[in-house]
């Protein structure tokens, strides 16, 4: 398999620039790779421990956003209101800015600082009643290093089959990341987001019948960033499954396809269930939104300063109030955002539960 990949990547292929280039992955790279077991990064929010991947993924974004939001009044944590949606969006912008400045594989990521109460308080103090249109990473580990920011206006490519696989706003299926949650009667519980590539943007290796992964687009070619392309280093992916624990016992698993939106939609879910007391299915079905005011992880890696994508079910009054605060709102239709699924087990009664997203008919909850 490694030799077949080696032979294939040495063949020049046409790039979106119109020029032919060979790949850089070699059999020696694959031979040197070793899978690893890594401790989860955890933080407590309102009595629930939230466990995430390390900073080779974007998992700590969710933890950082929760740390910023935790001390606020419950009324400011309701994503269905203008006040709550504004506060959540602004917290996410700050957490995602730190992702761009500090997250990567194998480096000295200042996670302890980023997830600390003092740092969260300093970030919270940056939130005003107006929507920010700046990328504002904190000095968690010194002076932050960022790549050059680019807007969509700089790109007019008509190339298809590149960038992010997702469902169209209309619900049309064009492929997407996969996520799976499983729980059994004994309390074993798994959250997995195993996606790595997709056929429409990955060349297929004829000898193997499989496609190359495409996550390396999530590295930067500029030198000096936390996720600059380096040999032997994983890209800083968007894959970010979640486990929830209470009193040291696992109670739920959740996650979502959706690229940069994965932790954003999971944040809405956690606020609605932990703070709002909603059922899992109610929280999944509720109107969703996400910010685009940060560099995207998928080519061409642009950002929309102040951007906020909302489902129309947020309501005209809420949407107008968000626009009045300076958010650049894009309406995405009634049932277009969010791809969550979840399972759980009550550690006292042993009762299992599951819930899944109904949007685009791509999520299912099943038990036996």
Which role does the model predict for each range below?
Residues 105, 186, 232-233, 266, ...:
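Extended C-terminal subregions enriched in glycine
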Residues 11-26, 157-160, 164, 170-173, ...:
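Active-site rim segments in enzyme catalytic domains, especially the processed small/beta chain
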Residues 48-55, 61-66, 74, 180-181, ...:
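Short, well-ordered beta-strand elements
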Residues 316-368:
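In a subset of proteins, long, contiguous C-terminal domains/tails are tracked
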Residues 33-34, 40, 53-56, 169-173, ...:
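Short Gly/Pro-enriched turn/cap motifs at secondary-structure boundaries
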Residues 1-55, 169:
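Accessory "access/gating" subregions that flank catalytic or transport cores
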Residues 5, 14, 23, 71-195, ...:
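Internal maturation/activation junctions in enzymes
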């Amino acid at each position: 398999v490694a030799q077949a990949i080696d032979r294939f990547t040495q063949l020049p292929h046409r790039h979106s620039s119109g020029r032919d280039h060979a790949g850089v992955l070699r059999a020696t790279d694959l031979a040197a790779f070793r899978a690893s077991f890594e401790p989860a990064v955890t933080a407590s929010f309102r009595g629930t421990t939230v466990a995430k991947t390390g900073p080779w993924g974007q998992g700590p974004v969710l933890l950082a956003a929760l740390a910023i939001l935790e001390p606020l009044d419950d009324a400011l944590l309701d994503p269905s209101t203008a006040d709550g949606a504004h506060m959540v969006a602004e917290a996410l912008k700050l957490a995602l800015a730190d992702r761009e400045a500090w997250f990567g594989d194998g480096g000295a990521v200042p996670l302890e600082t980023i997830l600390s109460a003092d740092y969260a308080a300093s970030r919270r103090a940056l939130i005003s009643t107006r929507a920010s249109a700046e990328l504002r990473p904190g000095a968690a580990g010194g002076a932050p290093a960022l790549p050059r920011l680019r807007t969509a206006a700089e790109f007019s490519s008509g190339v298809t089959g590149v960038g992010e696989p997702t469902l169209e706003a209309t619900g049309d299926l064009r492929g997407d990341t996969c996520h799976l949650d499983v729980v059994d009667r004994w309390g074993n519980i798994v959250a997995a987001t195993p996606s790595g590539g997709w056929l429409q943007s990955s060349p297929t290796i004829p000898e193997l019948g499989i496609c190359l992964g495409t996550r390396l687009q999530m590295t930067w070619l500029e030198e000096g960033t936390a996720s600059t392309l380096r040999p032997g280093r994983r890209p800083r992916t968007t894959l970010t499954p979640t486990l929830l624990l209470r009193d040291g016992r696992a109670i739920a698993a959740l996650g979502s396809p959706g690229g940069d939106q994965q932790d954003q939609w999971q944040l809405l879910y956690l606020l609605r269930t932990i703070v709002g007391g909603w059922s899992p299915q109610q929280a999944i079905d509720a109107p969703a939104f996400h910010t685009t005011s940060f560099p995207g992880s998928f080519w061409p890696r642009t950002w929309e300063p102040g951007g906020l994508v909302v489902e129309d079910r947020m309501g005209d009054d809420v949407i107008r109030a968000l626009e009045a605060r300076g958010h650049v709102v894009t309406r995405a239709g009634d049932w277009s955002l969010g791809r969550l699924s979840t399972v759980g087990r009550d550690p006292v009664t042993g009762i299992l539960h599951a819930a899944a997203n109904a949007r685009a008919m791509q999520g299912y909850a099943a038990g036996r």
